[in-house]
Each structure stands twice: as C-alpha cells, then as structure tokens.
C-alpha cells in the first residue's frame, strides 16, 4: 500500500472512531436503544422489563426537559402525555404510552439517525433471540395449526409471543435497513445493484422466517411494502410525476382501513359479514363483540380480566378500545395529515420508502395489533413524530422549559461513532469477499452443505409430538391427555417423541403424529444449518483474510 493510501485509510479510521453528539441526542439514543433491545429480545413482563422501561422513560424525560420547544409544541407534548397517562391508568395498557413516547421524542432527531440505530440494534436483538431459539436455549413458543393442506404443523415464534409477531418483527427489520439503502438513481431500477441486491436479500430473509412462522398476515405486510416500494421507485426512475389522483388514492388508504375496521363490524350484516369474518379468522366478530358489549369510552377500558381467546387483533380497534375515543381521534387525524404531507413531498428513495411503509402499516393494522400496543414495532410513529415537529416549527420561538437546562442539552460530547465503524467493517468484509471470492464462496458452500447434511441425517427423528393444548389451534373434538412428571421424563428420553412446553400433570396435552409436521421440521433444520453455518463460515474467512492482509501491510 502506498504511503498516500495508508494516510487516507488512517484518517478514515480516525474519523470513524468518534463524533460529537449533544446531550439531548444522547438521551434520545439511550431511550430508543433500551426500548429496541427490550422489545427486540421479546420481553413482555418481569422485573427486567419493568426496570428497563423505567430507565428508558427517565432518559426520555431528561431529553424533553433539556430540549427547546415553542409554545405550541409544549402544549401538545403536555396534553398528549397527560392524556396517554390517563388512558394507561384507565385501561391498564401501556401501549398508548409507548406510542406517544416515541412520537414526542423526535424533536431535533433526524429520521436517518433513528433508522440507523433501529437497523443495528433491532437486527442484533432479532438475531440473538432467533439463534437462541434455534439452538434450543430458551422456552420455545409456538402454535400448532393446520395450514396450507399440510395438516397440523408447528408454527414457531422463535422467542416472540406468536408466529405472526415473529414475521412482523422481521418485516420491521427490513423497514429499518431498506430506508438506509443509497440507490444509484442514474440507472434503471432493474440494473441498479445497490437497490436490487438489498431487495433480493430481504426476499430470501422473508421466505426463511416464513418457513418457521407460516404467518400469512406477516408475509402480506412485507409483500405490500416491497410491491409498493418497487412500483413507486420504478415510476420515479422512469421520470413519472406523482399525479394528484395518485396522491389522493394513497392518502385515502389509511382512513378507509380505519373506517372498515371500526364501523365495518357493526354495519355489515348477514352473508357479507359471515364471508369477511371467515376470511379474517373471526377478527370482525371479535371487534363486533367489543363494540356491542362494552361500547366506546373516552379514556379506554381495562380488559385484562377477559379470556385470552377474546382479544383484539385489529390495531385500530385496539387503539379505540384500550386508548379511548380521544386518543383514537387525535392519532387518526394526525396520521391522515402526515400521510397527506408525505405524498406531497419531493419524490425520492426515502420518500417512496416512507409511503410504502405507511401503506403496508395501514393494511396490516386491520388484522394485527402491533401498531398501537407495547410491541414497539410501528416504525411509522417515527415518521409521525418527525412530521409533527416539522409542521409546528415555524410557530413561535423555541425556548427550554427551564432556561438553564438548555445549556446542558446543547452541550456536545465526543462519543464512539458506532455507525461509521459498522459501515467500515461492512466495506472491509465486502472488499475481502470480492477479492477472495473463490475461497470465500468455496468454503462457505462446503460448510453449508456439510451443515445441511448433518442436520438432515442427525436432526429430528421424532414421529410424535406432545404439546400443551393451550398452544394448539385444533377442533374441540381432540382428546386431551395428561402426564405425570415421571411419564414426561421418560417420553423426553425417547428420540421419537417431541415434548413441547409441558407444565404439570394438570395441564392438558395433545398428541400429534402428522407425518408432514416432522418432514417440515427436517427441512427447517437443514435449511437453517446451511444458512447460518454457510454465512458464518464465509464471514469468518473474510475476517481471516482481512487480518492476513493487515499483517502484510504492516510488514
């Protein structure tokens, strides 16, 4: 390496080490990272969960206290926060408080910065959780369900509360990463590798996660997003202007979804209702039950005493019943205004991404509760918070709540530039993979084949599964069986029997001997072994080549 190139590389390395951030931004980063790790690892209760939430909200309170806001922003922050607290106390549900906290946190925070944090932290949490489940290191949540003509199969949640949640968690990961893609807009879409490769990687990842979750709603969420994004981006590359009719159509998707979800269950009658209810797996019937039995309240109601079988899967109904009418109207109006504002902005890759996310969110929220509950998977709340501060910025002079605190908030601190280091590492890995493509591809492929063969030969040999009845969606005619601890211990030692989440001798269990269930488990094991071992081996080879090249350069 020439001395000039070495100096340039050293300067790049030095700039990647640290950068300056204000205390206000650091407080936001701490809040957001804690929430991402907490929800990315699937925590839903317990002392760790409660402590982490308390620390995250303390960081957020500090961020708001030391920031500058105009009078309108202060009034809005106080009003919606107080309302969210009242809703929480009325319903016992933290979901609306989580949503409002993310919205109000977005002052002076760039969208790309938030998506960078989300991409790195959510991915790390997602991989850690799924790997721990694949290696059988934790409690394995699942649903046994008859799907796609295969008979009863195991739908794995891989650490999350439900297989649908797993698929949505992965799609959230895709949202974060695709927003950060830097396309080559000078090329047609089908010739732009910087765009096509990330899209293809996301497709492969989606199919892999779907192999475990068999979540049609989660898959549809991804397909709606990627179809909308590719369509909008192709039109942009072709030089097509976004017409008024197109803008209106996009803007109307959200309110139509809201109206269908909240009024549809009580307006539709007879056969029309029965058909839609069957298509949506009784979700409209549950919405109708809540509306006709409990009605709508201003601040939401506590439904914690209801059976787990009577839950609201529709996000809009969830917000209306748990958050109350006031917060429901505020968020629905804010979302509609934000979507209309977004479609009026300059057409760019990021703008198309935002629209695709909003369209996907609007449709998926009809059948899944992720948008306004405690899952922290609604990425569009970031866009909503950014929008509200943008449109309110011209109204009044920004001042701190307490003047002396603003000096603390504006104080800059030098901290490690994690994103720059990550990008630098990724570029070095890509360079090594390209430079040593044959050994990297050869070793990776060989490792993948060996891993798959080992998994297929020495993997699942079970021909029967015994699972908790509560985790199985079967017909009522299925006969429950009960086992003592001693009997279960004997069954666990039998390689032909798979015991899933046994609790005690009073817990009803079901037995399954569907051949397709165990063929599918073999296929999953083989593909997972090939994927993780192959990719891991390739990355290790790249790292080894980087170390060897670095040693040569020093000499």
Language model features by range: what are they?
Residues 119-137, 161-213, 220-223:
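Alpha-helical transmembrane segments of multi-pass inner-membrane proteins
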Residues 278, 283-311, 325-328:
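TM-adjacent membrane-interface loops and short helices in multi-pass inner/ER membrane proteins
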Residues 213, 233-274, 453-459:
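A membrane-periplasm/extracellular boundary helix in multi-pass inner-membrane enzymes
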Residues 41-50, 89-96, 161-163, 194-233, ...:
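Helix-loop-helix junctions and helix-breaking kinks within/between transmembrane helices
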Residues 83-126, 230, 235, 340-341:
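Transmembrane alpha-helical segments and their membrane-water interfaces
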Residues 325-362, 543:
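Hydrophobic transmembrane alpha-helices and their immediate junctions
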Residues 358, 362, 373-415, 532-546:
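Transmembrane alpha-helices of multi-pass inner-membrane enzymes
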Residues 126-163, 486, 493, 502-507:
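Membrane-interfacial helix-loop-helix modules of multi-pass inner-membrane proteins that assemble, modify
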